[in-house]
Amino acid sequence: MPKNHAVSAKHAEPFVKLSTRGANRLQARHPWVYRSDIVEEKDIPPGALVRVHDPRGKFLGTALYSSSSQIVIRMISHGSVVDLPALVAERIRAAITYRKDLIANTDAYRIVFSEADFLPGLIVDRYNDVLTLQILTQAMDAAPVREAIVQTLKEELQPAGIVERVEARIRELEQLPQLPSALLWGKKSSTEVRMNGVAFHYDGLEGQKTGAFLDQRENYAAAALYAHGEALDAFCYQGGFALHLAPKCSSVTGVD
């Protein structure tokens, strides 16, 4: 878990103390601790930054606290966090930079993937000039953090629109107010994207998850390499496999 200028020796309050089992999980670099491994906590606000200690009081790092989830803490740093919105902004920028070196031949890909980018509870996908985000934890839903997320995405990517996709069940579990999926910023919520040269229409306010299964991009291309004859794309959703197979097969049937 990286450290940077948003991390210092100053203390975030309040704190939680873990069981030996919980401390061992963190020391093995697991990013979560469950409620059954919290042995001391007191009057902690939902979504607060908390200092995390082992049973002997040793400082283990800083985490995001959930008052309702069985995943009580999600680690955000092995140091002490001074300014969560600034840290979130910096890590979004780092995630964008990292992907610029990896992503080619597509304008549709995941920019931020929660714990994988050291931003637990935040998902951001790029669909050409439309960005789609999901906020899944109390801490990421706090107004200053939300503002930092949107502002950083605007500055770094200059999108035509930013859409929030809401998972009602997750917000219920986190005891967050229910919101509709909506255009957060800009004027555009739909666009056209390309994966492996194949064009797809994208509507940020419709469909499953954040709108498409971006993790299947390489599988679409791989399937097309071996395709021939007649093909069936079952449970096809947007027809990702069917559209990739169509140029190679004599016929393709997509069924959803």
Q: Residues of each region from the PLM?
A:
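Short beta-strand element of Class I
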Residues: 250-256
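Short, well-ordered alpha-helix to beta-strand connector turns
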Residues: 30, 227-228, 249
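Conserved class I S-adenosyl-L-methionine
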Residues: 227-237
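Residue-level signal for inorganic ion chemistry
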Residues: 47, 129, 219, 235
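Non-catalytic accessory regions of SAM-dependent methyltransferases
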Residues: 1-128, 188, 255
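Conserved SAM-binding loop of SAM-dependent methyltransferases across substrates and taxa
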Residues: 238-250
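Cysteine-centered catalytic environments shared across enzyme families
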Residues: 83-106, 132-179
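Non-catalytic substrate-recognition/targeting regions of SAM-dependent transferases
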Residues: 112-125, 146-213, 221
